């Protein structure tokens, strides 16, 4: 009997029947590896393999086998996922698997009926699928029930773990698991699932911290890459492509057809997906909305059927579910324009193509998006399309470089050449989460002495780098502002201001949200926007344009009607960080003469033109370029964090360095004013500063309040500045790059 046969025979009948029903001819390598760790050891497990490789089944087959052989007297498994839609998707998959087993599965989040949840509370058994926010609510509001609900908990499965490591939300989960362990009195095995992860050992440590268990990371077998990949480039041919026909007529302009029809880039993207079941990814909700509206206009103008859907976090649950169901339906043809919400592992069946509008920000994002296509034995297929303004004769040098195209090529080459994936960034000082968990623990446990509260909170894994004296600063601030209150017995309880925060359901989430206004058309909920336009104004949402008919400010409702046209909409947001390796590879692309086989004709021509510019202007030899007169440009080829540090360093020492008028674009270049011939003196002085060591703390001004996370507004400024310098700036890379640039002289 082979090892695979032994594992198969160990599974109960309902799992074997599931395997037969799905016509699997054999267990996959990831399923064999998972079975070995979960059956033969007491280790934690991190599974990293491509989308649709059977990771979920790999984890659950052995776990459910144990629950079948040795039933749990409480909830036996917690499955945590970052999206409600992912939980809904997995719920139906696991429910199908468990149909004949007698093992219960319950999904629990804000959209699930109270009656469904009540059944679990009355009889806690089986598998609980839950979001971090709902788990937080359970810890606060049902603290006394935790031992009964989870007393015999065996496993915690964390899905899409790459989206959580290095974030407040991921650290919140680690706090929650530690708190559950504390309340039930025993450790629980952890299983992490991820399609792409840049630092598996780092993620394994993240998963294991505080458990005392080793985490096994089976090596996924990386075969030869099989992709269908293409990149094409277009210049923006019609600058009025952001304007609707109604707007044009309002401005006294005559236009026969929608402006998008005159733009070859949009036409090309439309043709790429019009006959293929596709996902179209953009890097922001604004771009997603605009592109979906553009596709609909082109379809209307050509007389084609409108098959275009949209999916992002500001849409109503019903609209998102409509897109998911239509994409899953094998009999229905659809194209969905999406953001990161469709990047994760929601099963959408057989997808023929992924279209990427501009370059993704990360290798991780590229692989996740590419992996959404190519299931059932077919290679993944992606087309990246780039659009930029056609440079004018007097366009400055830095704007002659196609940064998006370079980034797209760099991301692909880094994975092909090195299998590089960005490692997760680790936060050392998550003060926003520290504020949140302080209130959460006090709300759950009741009165604690300051010493007991500090001991409990600072023992949680995310806060091991926080000094006691810094936590004391936070606690005093919380006392002074009524978030905490001291009793006559010198104990701490939640104060009046803290109670107000805790009363809102929004408290359970540690990611930043906004006070959104709900948009309704008749009885249908369309989605949410941040700022309400005046009555009569128009805005875009769900790939369509709406005109405001009525505002209900007290209830935060906007009543609208649908109108023709296309407009832009803006949401606040952070576009994420780009790794230094991507910038370094972009430089090599610009300076080498390699012809990349996936570049289409226009993209090849655009890259050749950029290489010609780089060679003629000296970019191939120098990072600091004289643009003429007093204008200079520095190309440091640093990622977001290091670029941010260098920019602050130049600003702080500008007078000493003899520079002024500092401006920048993304993390690509910095321009400034300086006397002609001052470059050597500038770099020599920068080297002297680097030799003394760059103090990141000194780059944050005394009055600065760097607010980024949800509860940063409640954290003292001195702690925010300390966290910013520690977690958002970096000195070593900048010091090295300064020496490298000086070496060019």
Question: What residue ranges belong to the model's regions?
Answer:
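Phosphate-interacting basic helix/loop segments used at nucleotide- and nucleic-acid interfaces
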Residues: 262-266, 272, 327-335, 339, ...
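Short, conserved charged micro-motifs
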Residues: 641-647, 677-684
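A generic structural motif
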Residues: 109, 217-222, 306-308, 313, 556-561, 663-681, ...
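C-terminal accessory/connector segments of nucleic-acid motor ATPases
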Residues: 419-545, 550-551, 627-644, 654-665
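Helicase motor core with emphasis on the C-terminal RecA-like subdomain
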Residues: 2-8, 12-18, 29, 33-53, ...
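Terminal, basic amphipathic appendages of nucleotide-handling enzymes
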Residues: 17, 379-381, 502, 514, ...
């Amino acid at each position: 009997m082979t090892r695979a046969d032994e594992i198969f025979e160990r599974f109960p009948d309902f799992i074997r029947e599931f395997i037969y029903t799905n016509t699997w001819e054999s267990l996959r390598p990831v399923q064999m590896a998972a079975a070995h760790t979960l059956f033969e050891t007491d280790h934690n497990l991190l599974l990293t393999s491509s989308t649709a490789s059977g990771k979920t089944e790999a984890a659950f087959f052995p776990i459910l086998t144990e629950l079948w052989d040795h039933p749990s007297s409480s909830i036996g498994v917690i499955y945590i996922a970052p999206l409600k839609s992912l939980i809904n998707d997995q719920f139906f998959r696991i429910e199908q698997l468990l149909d004949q087993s007698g093992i219960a599965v319950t999904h629990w989040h804000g959209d699930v009926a109270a009656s469904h949840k009540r059944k679990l509370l009355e009889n806690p058994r089986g598998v609980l699928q839950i979001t971090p926010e709902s788990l937080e609510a359970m810890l606060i509001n049902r603290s006394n029930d935790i031992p009964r609900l989870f007393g015999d908990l065996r496993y915690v499965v964390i899905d899409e773990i790459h989206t959580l490591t290095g974030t407040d939300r991921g650290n919140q989960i680690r706090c929650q698991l530690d708190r559950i362990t504390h309340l039930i009195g025993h450790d629980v095995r952890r299983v992490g699932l991820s399609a792409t992860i840049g630092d598996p050992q780092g993620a394994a440590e993240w998963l294991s911290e505080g458990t005392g268990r080793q985490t096994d990371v089976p090596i996924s077998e990386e075969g030869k890459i099989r992709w269908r990949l293409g990149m094409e480039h277009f210049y923006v041919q019609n600058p009025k492509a952001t304007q609707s026909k109604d707007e044009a007529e309002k401005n006294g302009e005559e236009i026969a057809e929608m402006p998008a029809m005159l733009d070859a880039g949009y036409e090309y993207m439309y043709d790429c997906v019009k006959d293929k079941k596709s996902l179209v990814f953009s890097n922001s909700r604004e771009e997603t909305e605009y592109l979906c509206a553009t596709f609909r206009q082109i379809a209307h103008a050509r007389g084609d059927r409108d098959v275009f859907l949209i999916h992002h976090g500001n849409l109503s649950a019903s609209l998102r579910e409509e897109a998911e169901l239509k994409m899953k339906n094998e009999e229905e043809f659809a194209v969905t324009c999406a953001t990161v919400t469709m990047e994760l592992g929601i099963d959408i069946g057989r997808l023929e193509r992924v279209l990427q509008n501009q370059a993704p920000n990360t290798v991780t994002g590229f692989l996740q998006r590419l992996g959404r296509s190519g299931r059932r034995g077919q290679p993944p297929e992606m087309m990246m399309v780039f659009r930029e303004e056609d440079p004018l004769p007097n366009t400055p040098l830095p704007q002659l470089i196609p940064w998006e195209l370079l980034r797209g090529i760099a991301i692909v080459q880094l994975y092909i050449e090195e299998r590089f994936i960005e490692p997760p960034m680790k936060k050392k000082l998550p003060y926003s989460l520290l504020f949140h968990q302080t209130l959460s623990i006090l709300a759950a446990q009741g009165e604690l002495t300051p010493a007991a509260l500090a001991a409990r909170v600072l023992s949680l894994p995310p806060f091991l780098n926080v000094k006691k004296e810094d936590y004391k600063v936070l606690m005093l601030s919380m006392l002074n502002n009524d978030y905490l209150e001291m009793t006559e017995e010198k104990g701490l309880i939640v104060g009046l201001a803290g109670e107000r925060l805790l009363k809102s359901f929004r408290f359970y989430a540690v990611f930043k949200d906004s006070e959104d206004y709900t948009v309704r058309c008749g009885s249908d909920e369309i989605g949410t926007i941040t700022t309400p336009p005046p009555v009569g104004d128009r805005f875009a949402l769900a790939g369509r344009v709406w005109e405001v008919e009525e505002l209900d400010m007290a209830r935060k409702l906007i009543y609208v009607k649908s109108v023709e046209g296309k407009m832009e909409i803006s949401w606040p947001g952070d576009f994420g960080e780009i790794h230094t390796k991507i910038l370094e590879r972009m430089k090599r692309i610009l300076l080498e003469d390699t012809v990349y086989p996936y570049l289409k004709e226009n993209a090849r021509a655009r890259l050749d033109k950029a290489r010609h510019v780089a060679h003629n202007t000296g970019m191939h030899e120098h990072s600091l370029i004289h643009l003429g007169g007093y204008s200079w440009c520095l190309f440091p080829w640093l990622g977001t964090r290091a670029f941010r540090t260098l920019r602050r360093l130049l600003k702080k020492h500008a007078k000493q360095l003899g520079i002024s008028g500092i401006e920048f674009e993304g993390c690509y270049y910095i321009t400034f004013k300086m006397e002609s011939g001052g470059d050597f003196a500038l770099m020599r002085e920068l080297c002297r500063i680097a030799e003394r060591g760059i103090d990141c703390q000194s780059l944050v001004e005394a009055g600065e309040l760097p607010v980024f996370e949800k509860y940063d507004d409640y954290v003292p400024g001195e702690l925010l500045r300390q966290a910013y310098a520690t977690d958002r700036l970096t000195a070593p890379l900048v010091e090295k790059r300064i020496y490298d640039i000086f070496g060019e002289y």
